[in-house]
């Protein structure tokens, strides 16, 4: 009996120890491990950050844009103060557009030799891109091309995600975030419709057809700005603005409103049938 009682006591102590570990020690260990992964896995000092940024600046001045982009992407993986991360992200996104609007070939572009009978609109249609993007990528100031010319053509699939909770539009190239833009979305009573749509038409200097009136592109009363990208949901789209102070707020009639310089950039990049996903 004494031996049995001793075994029982040992067993109970073992169970108590196991339960203590399960209830208290394991969560503490998991929390510590998670903290190490998120806050100290990739530490970097301000001195190291400044040195890296100076090196990137030298690369940019030397025209080594792709190497500079890679360095930015590496830096963003480090543990950084929120303000530094935001600055780096903006610099990377601006560089993304600079590379896109240059003749530098990337993994999502292809070289093309102009053939007899070619025209920019034919090439754009063939590769599901835009005339504007071909011109910007090859620094062309007119539509005329000649046989034998070498062109950089984008083969990326672009998509757009609009988050109405923070009034931000994200442009993706395949699955890589290319650039983030501030926007205005629907005000109270005129919400921006949540869902997935496609761009079905694109207009330069659009006419505004509002209830009971037609407002010409050159009228100060035309709030559509310089570009229109219409959705598969009739009456809705992405457009510019004559009210730049509203960007970043819920102020539109339900459409996605952008600064004119931003919508012109977006307009040049995305072709018809681009997917637009609106989330909250």
Predicted regions and their residues:
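N-terminal secretory signal peptides that target proteins for export/translocation
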Residues: 1-11
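Bacterial N-terminal signal peptides
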Residues: 16-27
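Exported/periplasmic cell-wall-interacting domains
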Residues: 215-280
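Extracellular LysM carbohydrate-binding repeats and other cell-envelope/extracellular binding modules
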Residues: 74-107, 130-163, 279
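Primarily a LysM-type cell-wall glycan-binding module
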Residues: 41-66, 99-128
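Alpha-helical, heptad-rich or low-complexity scaffold/stalk segments
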Residues: 36-95
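Gly/Pro-biased beta-strand-loop elements
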Residues: 155-242
């Amino acid at each position: 009996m004494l031996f049995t009682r001793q075994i029982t006591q040992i067993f109970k102590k073992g169970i108590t120890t196991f339960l203590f570990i399960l209830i208290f020690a394991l969560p503490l260990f998991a929390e510590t491990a998670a903290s190490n992964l998120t806050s100290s896995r990739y530490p970097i000092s301000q001195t190291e950050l400044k040195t890296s940024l100076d090196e990137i600046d030298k690369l940019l001045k030397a025209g080594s844009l792709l190497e500079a982009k890679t360095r930015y992407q590496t830096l963003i993986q480090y543990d950084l103060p929120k303000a530094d991360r935001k600055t780096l992200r903006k610099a990377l996104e601006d560089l993304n557009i600079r590379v896109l609007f240059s003749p530098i070939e990337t993994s999502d572009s292809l070289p093309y030799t102009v053939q007899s009978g070619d025209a920019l609109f034919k090439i754009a249609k063939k590769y599901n891109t835009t005339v504007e993007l071909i011109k910007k990528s090859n620094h062309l100031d007119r539509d005329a091309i000649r046989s034998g010319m070498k062109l950089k053509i984008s083969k990326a699939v672009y998509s757009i995600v609009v988050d109405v909770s923070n009034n931000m539009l994200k442009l993706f190239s395949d699955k890589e975030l290319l650039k983030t833009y501030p926007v205005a979305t629907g005000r109270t009573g005129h919400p921006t419709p949540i869902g997935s749509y496609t761009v079905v038409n694109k207009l330069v200097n659009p006419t505004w057809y509002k209830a009971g009136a037609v407002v010409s592109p050159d009228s100060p009363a035309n709030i559509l700005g310089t570009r229109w990208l219409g959705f598969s949901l009739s009456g809705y789209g992405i457009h510019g603005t004559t009210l730049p102070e509203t960007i970043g707020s819920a102020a539109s009639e339900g459409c996605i409103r952008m600064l004119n310089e931003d919508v012109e950039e977006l307009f040049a990049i995305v072709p018809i049938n681009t997917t637009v996903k609106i989330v909250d």
